[in-house]
Amino acid sequence: KDYDLLAKEREISVVNQLTDQQTYLNPSVLKLILSNLISNAVKHSVQGGYIKIGTEDGWVFIENSCTLEEQDKFEQSFTTSSRQSKGAGLGLFVVKSLLENEEIDYHFERDDDHLVFFMKLPQVNPESD
């Protein structure tokens, strides 16, 4: 909801298909990861583009329409060991650090006009009572 205004200004369609799920992760950490990823997607999507948030095969994903140049910047943020890459904001550095600290698997897939970021959140084992 925090990004609705910016998304409206840029005519970006946001489709949130996330459902309530239990995960074994500090809610504050999860909120920080998601808010930074969504903020980045809104800021770097093409005018009139889209952002789609959902789950697929146990992975949470955020997909957004963006240029190849923006995809390069995003990839550099996650492949450099420090915050050296030009154009990589503090938000993505924080996301990478949190994901690695929490040992959360992540990857992304690129295409000509969009990027999809995936992360595998630790699930609560329903049989561990």
PLM-predicted stretches and their roles:
Residues 6-15:
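Short conserved segments within the C-terminal catalytic ATPase subdomain
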Residues 61-85:
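Glycine-rich/acidic phosphate-handling loop/turn and adjacent ATP-lid/helix
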Residues 102-111:
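Glycine-rich ATP-binding loops of the HATPase_c
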